[in-house]
A protein has these predicted regions:
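HotDog/MaoC-like acyl-thioester-processing domains
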Residues: 1-30, 35-37, 101-201, 267-270, ...
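Hot-dog-fold acyl-thioester-processing enzymes
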Residues: 2-102, 187-252
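Short, structured beta-strand/loop micro-motifs enriched in basic residues and often containing a Trp
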Residues: 98-104, 256-261
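Short flexible/disordered coil segments
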Residues: 130-131, 229, 260
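Glycine-centered flexibility motif
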Residues: 163, 214, 238, 243, ...
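A conserved acidic, glycine/proline-rich C-terminal tail/linker
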Residues: 248-275
Length: 302
């Protein structure tokens, strides 16, 4: 990754002010002409934030986590969401086009995040990867550091961009990058070594996560908002799903979940009662019909 000077940005603080600016950017991106500069080289974006005890407790309450083992919760999400909005504008992608495909999360500091600490988040746009003839994946890396410059967490996200022109996709510089095939069938359902955990996804979980993370995408706030984007009902955010799973695995094994690789295959509806299946290093989330919603790998440690 070439060394580039960071671009500073501020994340809006107030609830109403943030929501107003967020939805303004959403509808602005929908109405604007797409320039589709997906292979742009953008400088990293930087912001700082402060983790209060109240904010920490709000994240714990969201996931129902009450143990002392530090977990890889995405406290830095508000910075990442706002940076994503800026980058989407720079590369000319409408907000309504994207869908979260996968995340890779690594908590580098074994003590995790600390209350009453200042942190910096650097968001890097990593470019584009092939998906299919008319779709690609765009990639982002968020690096969170403390005031001493130590890396606390790395989070890499892949977003799906569909409905592109075949000729446009063909001319992108993606040499040597082959499309990745994803398994869409549950493998742990009949595995005798897998534990089974019943989850309850509340009707307003996406809304609660949105208020904490800044991801106020209408698809996750209400069924009406979801239908505006062509979905039958609302579903929780990808990183909301990740945080819920991290909490459940940490509680189940009574240890810290330090590393997670997760693929989002089908929406996790709200409300719903999916089942989390897990072995010592793999997990799957399935619905009542046995459809695979989410799958991934993880590492836990004490």
């Amino acid at each position: 990754m070439a060394k580039q000077k960071s671009t500073w940005f501020d994340t809006p603080k107030s609830g109403f002010g943030y929501a107003s600016k967020f939805y303004y950017k959403v509808f602005q991106s929908i109405s604007q002409d797409e320039s589709l500069s997906l292979d742009s080289e953008l400088p990293p974006m930087k912001t700082t934030w402060f983790l209060t005890e109240k904010k920490m407790q709000a994240w714990l309450d969201l996931t129902g986590y009450d143990l002392s083992y530090p977990q890889a919760f995405t406290f830095s999400a508000p910075a990442g969401v706002w940076a994503l909005m800026q980058v989407l504008k720079e590369i000319g992608i409408s907000f309504g086009r994207i869908m979260h495909l996968s995340s890779r999360l690594l908590m580098i500091n074994k003590d995790g995040f600390q209350v009453d600490e200042h942190y910096s988040t650097y968001v890097h746009y990593l470019g584009v990867k092939p998906h299919s003839k008319r779709a690609v994946m765009i990639r982002f890396l968020s690096v969170v550091k403390n005031v001493r410059g130590q890396d606390i967490m790395h989070l890499e996200d892949e977003l799906y961009v569909a409905g592109l022109d075949e000729e446009f996709v063909a001319q992108l510089d993606m040499k040597g990058l082959a499309p990745e095939r994803r398994n869409t069938k549950a493998l742990l359902t009949n595995n005798p070594m897998a534990d089974s955990i019943q989850l309850t996804i509340g009707r307003s979980l996406g809304q609660k996560y949105g208020k904490l993370s800044g991801d106020l995408n209408p698809m996750h706030i209400s069924s009406i908002g979801a239908r505006l984007f062509g979905h039958k009902s609302s579903f929780i955010q990808g990183l909301c799903t990740l945080n819920v799973i991290v909490a459940e695995l940490g509680r189940h094994w009574k240890s810290s979940i330090r590393s997670v690789e997760i693929e989002f295959l089908r929406p996790v509806s709200q409300p719903s009662k999916p089942t989390l299946l897990c072995t010592l290093d793999h997990f799957e989330l399935v619905d009542r019909e046995g459809n695979l919603l989410v799958s991934g790998r993880y590492i836990c440690s004490n």
